[in-house]
Amino acid sequence: MKICGIVTEYNPFHNGHLYHIEQARKLSQCDVLIAVMSGNYVQRGQMAIIDKHTRAHFAVQNGVDIVLELPYIYATQSASKFAKGAIDILKMAKVDTICFGSETNNLIELQEIANTSINIDNLKELMNTGNSFPKAYGLLSSSMASNDILAVSYLKALKDTNIKAISIQRTNNYHDETLTKIASAKAIRKAIYDHEDVSIATAMPITYEQCVFLRQFYP
């Protein structure tokens, strides 16, 4: 039995996520698709726009077989810790492959980056100019898009495993706020808060009132 794993937030679930599920199944030829999904809190430290149970239900309705929760301690961390927590769960689930989206969609290049460590000389040079360690580390990664950074983090976490990585081309930019059929989750969230109709980008029935209600629980 072939098992494929994906790592998700679904904040909210949209057409791009549906494409990811379809491609993961097609490219891996898996019998079972497992999604590791953030719970009620997501990587940027905010509460998810929709509760985890509704998001998991929608994932199963759209092609995922099993949804496993990524614990809060990993879900709200940096890319490397987020990825390590998710990959550890998928390793325990005995997956054969993982499938993720990336902007470059070049596994060879991403793997080469994953095989290297931080350039300490550049890091020290950036810190000597007055940057803090987190800012200096961020500047070293500034030329990489968000999903490429996550992809490298997944590949680092997969080191010394037999799990095969599959990359698919991300069809939009995370920071793109244009609402189209394949729109970023960020664009959809902004549109909801602006009282816009988001049905072109997501089949998830999300109301402005739901999102405003959840905002009161943001940390």
Model regions: which residues?
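N-terminal catalytic cores of NTP/NDP-binding nucleotidyl/phosphoryl-transfer enzymes
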Residues: 1-55
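Short beta-strands and strand-loop turn motifs
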Residues: 6-7, 36-37, 68-70, 166-169
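Short, contiguous strand/loop micro-motifs
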Residues: 8, 42-43, 59, 73-74, ...
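Non-catalytic positions within long, well-ordered alpha-helices that form the structural scaffold/packing
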Residues: 25-26, 60, 87-91
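Short, high-confidence coil segments that cap the C-terminus of an alpha-helix
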Residues: 28-31, 64, 95
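A glycine-rich helix N-cap at a beta->alpha junction
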Residues: 57-71
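Active-site cores that bind ATP or allylic diphosphates and position pyrophosphate for catalysis
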Residues: 70-219
